[in-house]
Amino acid sequence: MTAAIYLVKGREKSVKRKHPWIFSRGIGKVEGEPALGETVDVFTHDGKWLAKAAYSPESQIRARIWSFEKEEINKAFFVKRFQNAQLLREDVIERDGLTGYRLIAAESDGLPGVTIDRYQNFFVCQLLSAGAEYNKQAIVDALVECFPDCNVYERSDVAVRKKEGLKETTGVLHGEEPPKSVVIEENGVKISVDIVGGHKTGFYLDQRDSRQQAMKYVKDKEVLNCFSYTGGFGLYALKGGAKRVINADVSQPALDTAKYNAELNEFDISKKRAVFLNADVFKLLREYRDQGTQFDVVIMDPPKFAESKAQLNGACRGYKDINMLALQILKPGGTLLTYSCSGLMDQVLFQKIIADAAVDANRQVKFVERFEQAADHPTDTAYPEGFYLKGFACKVL
């Protein structure tokens, strides 16, 4: 018999609106002894069936909903989800010429805690919830059925798994170990991805649209690409005709890959048209400001500053300081392209932070364009938390 949870009276409202999370305070009774990640039936306080969910006894999000239908959570279930997700993305895959894209965006694709990125024929999984871990083999088997020649690699080396009572883990789940370099293509740009050792699942696929949109601001411009990682924005800047691009990052291996990517695309990087600078971005910006060095375009795509609500105030200060410094080194008429991937910081708050940075920088700034995550990272209407990446193009007078 399937274990069950009964909600506190009134707590069923969000479930009826199809939100996939049930918090611990919303559960009135647990029937049976569900194991970590096991599928349970969800009922109202008076016994009306609502959903199928994965139970996680150690997490504040006590249950994550798999389905609002009375169906088994098995290989066939995941096959259907993968087929729907692939179909949803077919247009953008063809439009942008993608050989690397997000196949599954967790809750937004109806699979809580499951993220799957595709790089050529390597499918990289992050399984961040107890339910995802419990159903790992079914997920792998479903991928193999949908994509028979696939290789499946796990990159569940993410600290959030501890909140679910899980250990961090990586490794081959099916097929071959990824090589050091898997080359993908997007919008005609070739990018080398290190699946095993790179950030996230290997690359920041969510910024693809922003990289493309950045091209219209860079022709014949001096560009500073901050937190450049393996050079994504810098590659598009070179493609867009930038006069010079400085890629700044604290990781020398990432910069080495950025240079390799520029060579892979046969961009002209002679005469210092492209520079790969190993530097702490905060210190570098202060040095440029103090030296009076200025740029036409500054691209600011920092790592996530806030992992929890407790870190949000500190993150706000960090975002304000770094954007203030960026504004101070822009030429009159210059452009700041700035982004935040912190889900806890919404677009309104981020816009206020940029406005505060403009005041502190003593610069007059206009918002001229807004950005969000790429089209293969959809946001379900019932799950606004799926909208996490936001950005602005700002003109400095």
UniProtKB/Swiss-Prot annotation:
Keywords: Cytoplasm, Methyltransferase, RNA-binding, rRNA processing, S-adenosyl-L-methionine, Transferase. It catalyses: cytidine(1962) in 23S rRNA + S-adenosyl-L-methionine = 5-methylcytidine(1962) in 23S rRNA + S-adenosyl-L-homocysteine + H(+). Its EC number is 2.1.1.191. Residues 2-79 form the PUA domain. InterPro entries: PUA, PUA-like_sf, PUA_sf, RLMI, RlmI-like_PUA, SAM-dep_methyl-trfase, SAM-dependent_MTases_sf. GO terms for molecular function: RNA binding; rRNA (cytosine) methyltransferase activity. Its main location: cytoplasm. It is found in: Cytoplasm. GO terms for cellular component: cytoplasm. It is an enzyme of class 2 (transferase). It holds the Pfam family PUA_3. Gene3D superfamilies: PUA domain, RNA methyltransferase domain (HRMD) like, Vaccinia Virus protein VP39. Belongs to the methyltransferase superfamily. RlmI family. Specifically methylates the cytosine at position 1962 (m5C1962) of 23S rRNA. This is Ribosomal RNA large subunit methyltransferase I. It comes from Vibrio parahaemolyticus serotype O3:K6 (strain RIMD 2210633). The gene is rlmI.
